[in-house]
Amino acid sequence: MATRKARNPLAFMPWPVTILTTAMYLALIIPLLVIHHNVPPAPRTSPNGLNLTEAWQDLQSLTKGFHPYNSHQNDEVRSWLLERIDAIKQSTPSTEEYRDAKEEKPDVFVFDDLVSNLTFIDKSVGVYFEGTNILVYIRGSEDNKQNWWETPGRAPVGKGGVLVNAHYDSVSTGYGATDDGVGVVTCLQLVKYFLTPGHAPRRGLVVLFNNGEEDYLNGARVYSQHPMARFAHTFLNLEGAGAGGRATLFRSSDTEVTQAYAKSEHPFGSVLSANGFEKGLISSQTDYVVLEGILGLRGLDVAFFEPRARYHTDQDDARHTSIDSLWHMLSTAVATTEELVSDTTDRFDGHIRDDGTVPSGSGTRAVWFDLFGSAFAVFRLHTLFALSVTLLIVAPLTLLVTSVILSRADKMYLFRSSVYSEINDDYIPLRGLRGFFRFPFLISIPTGVTVGLAYMVTKVNPFIAHSSSYAVWSMMISAWIFLAWFVSRVANSARPSAFHRVYTWTWMFVLTWSLMVVCTVYEHEEGLAGGYFIFFYFAGTFLATWISYLELFALPTKSEYVGRLAESRRPSTQGSRLAASGDEHQDDAAEEDPTESTSLLHGRHRPTFANYVRVGVDRASQDEEEEEEDPNVYEHEQGWSGVLPRWTWLLQLLITAPVILMLIVPLALLTTSALSQTGQDGSPQLLIYLFISCLTALLFAPMLPFIHRYTYHLPIFLLFVFIGTMIYNLVAFPFADSNRLKLFFLQEVDLDNGISTASLTGMPPFVSDVTYGLPSAAGQNESCDWTFRGKRKLQRCSWSAPLPHVVPDGDSLSVSSEDADSLLDATELSPDWISFSISHPQRDSSSVRFEVSGQNTRNCRINMDGNSITNFSVIGSSAPDHRFLNPSPDGLNRIQLWSRTWDNKWTVDVDFSKHDSSETDEVDESSITGRITCLWSDNNRVGLIPALDEVRQFSPAWVAVTKFSDGLIEGSRAFEIKRSSLGALGS
């Protein structure tokens, strides 16, 4: 007769367990990988109100050249944008067509802002910026019909509107296709869409094309000075921190505004990324921090996030993105904006605030994440907190009550090694404690080894994740699964136990309960929702554990089992005693007739230790043989285990693995893409490898209750995978043409002595190898030191470089991009690149007046050798805005000056402190020293910056060059001010 386990194809047996668990993991991981790396296709026919072909052509026009704020190409992009906006406005359908759609034709206003300026202080840096933003306002059907902005100081009337923001400047080394060209053309299409009959907004829509985001978020800051900045209450910021792929929801301000994003056809993102920004794990910032943090709007930050290696390089172009990526951001923006402008409730309106922020009301902190890139879950953090607290209490109580019921039913075999038998007047072994101490080794050994691998890779080949992150994942996963299987098989061979599964689930329950406590505390104290997946992880683990406890009700009572076992042993025991008695009689008879060979000792006084051991072993062996008479018992497991259900393991797998994989795999992929290529920026590489090792344990821990049933085929295969990937990860070169290493370029020209020094900054030893492989640097003494770019410590290697051609000879002060070739004839260094003067506007004052001008630029600086500036003002600037004043108590050491016109002369009044807080006894306190620096960023002609051209031409194919600072060229002249010449300071 066939046994129960033989008849059941889903039984807890090696082949079903191996095949089904492997199939389930692959069936979920593979689609998630495909979704992560493949963008949903754009429709063949553009939806009503949109034109994808036109949008793609606009992107190509926008990205013809590098167009940073301080470039002539930027002016051309601005002119082109105004033309495109005007063309869209002129093509607006007639009033009759709107009537057919039962709508009123909306009013459209275009603001070409060449007036707004802003002076702000951020710690030790002061900035004066003149904006060149473009705003398009589409009046909503429920907006006030008056042009309230035409009256100075007048506040908007009625409900707040919606702002969509993108910046049209790029960095000086990137074409800006995704940073932020796609965002810009999306904004153009939004203007077109909401001017199409059937889509007229109910709330007013402001579309902002800001200029200057790449430098201190200047464009968004100066937008605050425009009257329309008081109108919008919600916003959608479109950005690019990668160079293609999907656009992810980086962060959001609250639940209510995030619900608008949930209307997107292909939502993508997790609240974990928002927590990364909040805790400073992601250092780069977007206009979101200005719009939400300073102006008080409530909104969303949507951006491209990979591949990071193309970000701010010449591969951020139309060639390396796609119309599918464009459609992903455009469709998201349309759905989100349409939901926001259609909202007529008061949830985005509040009372006027004293701090100058807009009265946008207050929202609730949110939890949000996508599911397979097609659905989006969003709910309040308070809801997650309430559910977490409830589950933390209910789950252990449920297991406790179940355990009590099992004990009263006399079926609590757990934690019992034996039970007393009145029949035999002895303890009968249950072996119910077997397998209890297995889990700590089962989890710690594989995880400890993968953590060790993380440290080893960081030591030997730290940047391999830059181009081969999946090789790292393969190494970690294969090592973890093989070791988990090996440890479980060794343990199960030595002490087979039917309780391996229930004990493993119990340990996992305790572990996830502890993690849940930590996450719940952070939810309440810090407002962090990134641990939402732990809630679902714990919930699944609890249910799986409870199922294992409920299985115990299928067991016979312990007394019944012991009684049956005792009865089965009674005859054999009596027979043994009779046999033993007969042996004794025979021995006695033999002793009565001693012979010459008889021992001198009497037989009954012989040592009996050997006999005792043999009898004990025979009894234990006999117990096991009697227990194993049940054909449903697996191998050498406990005899009572034959009645346990054989299919519940699959239910446990279905409850835990799918949910865990659906939530954690996207997080793993998202974070891997975001972090794997940040090491080139100076981020600690160990972080990504530790992240992968820990995520591996979380992803595959649901296998542990079943892994001792695996056949050897898959683990042995994974062992070979581990060996191969480990060797590859240790010896392979970490960079490739498609995953280049970014080096940061800067050329500094001392206009006082004509010294021109170029430098490349990046990670050692690659930066020095590249630098001194250049023709102009060959033969020069290596000059490398350490510097900081932001908070990241990097190596900088310098060499004497040919002069740039950024300023024309003769009397010409500026050139357009069409005439930029004339700069190539400028071969002589002229101190007239920068002109400045220093005077005292008031005799008895600590103020000094600087007049600064640079040729063919609109960006200069006043750099101090110490933090000696207490205040400054630019003549002709607007009144200071207290929202943007955040000075350091030590004072300022730099003033950044930006002008919307070329060759501008800034007049700056600077107040100095009596004593420089950074000065030491070795510094001459009788004078104030510094440098006037101007910057040049125009890089659209070969030959303008020979050193940069040389880097691009002669660097290896796996190297990309990007800007180190605001400008590619910094020309400077020194100045000195005698403190005795300052009236107040000299008195």
Curated annotation (Swiss-Prot):
Gene Ontology annotations of biological process type = proteolysis
Vacuolar face: residue ranges? 36-384, 457-466, 523-526, 671-686, 737-987
Cofactors demanded by this protein: Zn(2+)
Species of the source: Penicillium rubens (strain ATCC 28089 / DSM 1075 / NRRL 1951 / Wisconsin 54-1255) (Penicillium chrysogenum)
Q: Where is this region: Disordered?
A: 572-600
**Disulfide bond annotation, renumbered to this chain:** none
Q: How is the cofactor bound?
A: Binds 2 Zn(2+) ions per subunit.
Membrane topology term = Multi-pass membrane protein
Cite the source lineage.
Eukaryota, Fungi, Dikarya, Ascomycota, Pezizomycotina
Q: Which residues are glycosylated?
A: 51, 117, 781, 871
Does the record carry Ribonucleoprotein as a key word? Answer: no
Per UniProt, what is one GO molecular function of this protein? metalloexopeptidase activity
User: Residues at site: Transition state stabilizer?
Assistant: 311
The name of this protein is Vacuolar membrane protease
